[in-house]
Amino acid sequence: MMTVRQLLSILSSQKEELEANDLTSFVSRYEEPIINLDSKMAQVVIGVRRSGKSTICEKVLREKVGDFAYVNFDDERLVSLKTDELDTLLEALYRLNGDFKYLFLDEIQNIDGWQLFVNRLLRQKIHILITGSNSKLLSSELMTHLTGRHNRINLYPFSLSEYCG
């Protein structure tokens, strides 16, 4: 069982890493305007590995809202995290970020039962942005638990005009 202190340490290092990213040279993607951060539905960005899901989400969040909470579940330090520890994670997020309205959950499909956690956060009026791979997020579980509560955005590798642009 992970403690708030352990999670706070992990989340703090993830936040520092994220804030160090320089997104000024990144290419704008056609999908950026589709991500509706003010929606009551979770914004779920799905795509193949290394297609830029995390980058596009970070870019949109920085440009449109500025301050947001962030968790990267594709982190070996969080691999043992269980569903019943998500409340502890949430407590650590509040301690680190204060009272946030936007939450970026990167690769959350690595946690079993994450959908019910996201549903609860949506009911609490937190705007959720999720990234994940096609194989896991396109499962029937996503469609069952988040039906009517998510906007799926498919992110493909660069188009020719984006690549040349």
Residue ranges and their predicted role:
Residues M1-G165:
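Phosphate-binding site recognition
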